[in-house]
From Swiss-Prot:
Protein name, UniProt field: Protein-glutamate methylesterase/protein-glutamine glutaminase 3
Similarity-based family: Belongs to the CheB family.
PTM sites of type 4-aspartylphosphate: 59
Name of the coding gene: cheB3
InterPro entries: CheB-like (IPR008248), CheB_C (IPR035909), CheY-like_superfamily (IPR011006), Sig_transdc_resp-reg_Me-estase (IPR000673), Sig_transdc_resp-reg_receiver (IPR001789)
Stretches assigned to the Response regulatory domain: 8-126
First-level EC class: hydrolase
Location within or outside the cell: Cytoplasm
GO cellular component term of the entry, any: cytoplasm
Keyword Hydrolase (UniProt): yes
Taxon lineage: Bacteria, Pseudomonadati, Myxococcota, Myxococcia, Myxococcales
Organism name: Myxococcus xanthus (strain DK1622)
GO molecular function, one term: protein-glutamate methylesterase activity
Length: 355
């Protein structure tokens, strides 16, 4: 897309007040032009086809055709980059958000729950920034055919895996977790960048697609094989030398931090740690994945063809944290093949590298 041309945005919200506010906040960014507004899902589908916007901001609780239904129709008829803007306080809205991600939405953002003008303006700048980033993402209406996966690494088997994801991550995680068996012999830790307020909804949604129990980790909890753990909203998830989960408030940057999580796995488990970086913008996860590789552990990153956004996997390749990209469809098998089938022991194995 030419840098001179404005980013054309379609705003979809059934509340005229909210639509007016979103329009005003977005157009404070000189690069953005709001070209249309829709108050229901059917009108959104019509305007997406007529206007061909670069980005659509989509509410979910819409009259008639709801948000996920509208997104599915748009992605099949006139694909666009879709940014969900929904009320976090409403559980149905949160749950619909992950249905929207499955239908093709790229990102979830909670509606502002503020009355202070300065805080509202700050939220608006973050929204506009997200729209500008989304405008650079290639529109994907159909997943390309996966390439052949590399053979699994030989050597030490893995006792714990950490997975990092951002834009496009929830559907990718659902795809991977749905193919892992209940007998998975290791704990699986997830750092998915997401707006505060959506984590519990993501846990509920993923629990419906995988045989593995999915939960939010508690500080000091002993990690169990065959379970999936997410951090508490606004926190990073780490592992200590005894194999216990540790939560700490995020210190800025991507939240939760994939680098923080993966680095803790490398320190605690050494050559028996494993890390995966999936689709996403930016560079989070690359340093942590490199720490695992330097400790002798197993590392994978998603390939470009199956990534919604190749930024994070590319960063992992650039720092040589992994040798080549892996098709998303091959990731579950590689994770399984890398796991030890001995009992999970927790902590650094005997003979692992020193800190």
């Amino acid at each position: 897309m030419s840098v001179q041309r404005p980013i054309r945005v379609l705003v979809v919200d059934d509340s005229p007040t909210m639509a007016n506010m979103l329009t005003a906040l977005l157009t404070e960014e000189p690069r953005i032009e709001v070209v249309g507004r829709a108050g229901d899902g059917n009108r959104a589908v019509q305007l997406a086809r007529l206007l061909r916007p670069d980005v659509i901001t989509m509410d979910l609780l819409l009259p008639g055709l709801d948000g996920p239904g509208a997104i599915a129709a748009i992605m099949s008829q006139s694909p666009a980059r879709i940014l969900v803007v929904s009320a976090v306080a409403e559980q149905r809205g949160v749950d619909l958000g992950f249905q929207a991600m499955s239908a093709g939405a790229l990102e979830l953002i909670g509606k502002p729950n503020v009355t202070n003008a300065e805080e509202l303006r700050r939220w608006g700048k973050e929204l506009a920034h997200s729209v500008c980033l989304m405008a650079e993402v290639p529109v994907i209406s159909r997943r390309p055919r996966a390439a052949t996966a590399p053979p699994p690494p030989t050597g030490a088997r893995v006792d714990i895996f950490g997975v990092v994801a951002s834009t496009g991550g929830p559907p990718a995680l659902a795809d991977v977790l749905s193919k892992l068996p209940r007998s998975l012999p290791v704990p699986l830790l997830i750092a998915q960048h997401i707006t505060v307020g959506f984590t519990q909804g993501m846990v509920r949604w993923l629990s419906q697609v995988t045989p593995l129990p999915v939960s939010i980790a508690k500080d000091g909890e002993r990690l169990e094989p065959g379970r999936v753990y997410f951090p508490l909203d606004g926190h990073d998830l780490l592992v200590d030398a005894a194999g216990l989960a540790r939560l700490q408030p995020s210190q800025g940057g991507p939240c939760p931090s994939g680098d923080v999580m993966l680095t803790s796995l490398a320190a605690a488990f050494g050559r028996r740690s494993g890390g995966v970086v999936l689709t996403g913008m930016g560079e989070d996860g690359a340093r942590g994945l490199l720490a695992i590789r330097r400790a002798g552990g197993v590392t994978f990153s998603q390939d470009e063809a199956s990534s919604v956004v190749f930024g994070m996997p590319r960063a992992a390749l650039d720092v040589k944290a992994t040798d080549q990209g892996v098709p998303l469809a091959s990731m579950p098998e590689l994770i399984l093949q890398s796991c030890t089938f001995a009992p999970f022991r927790g902590g650094r194995p005997e003979g692992g590298p020193t800190r």
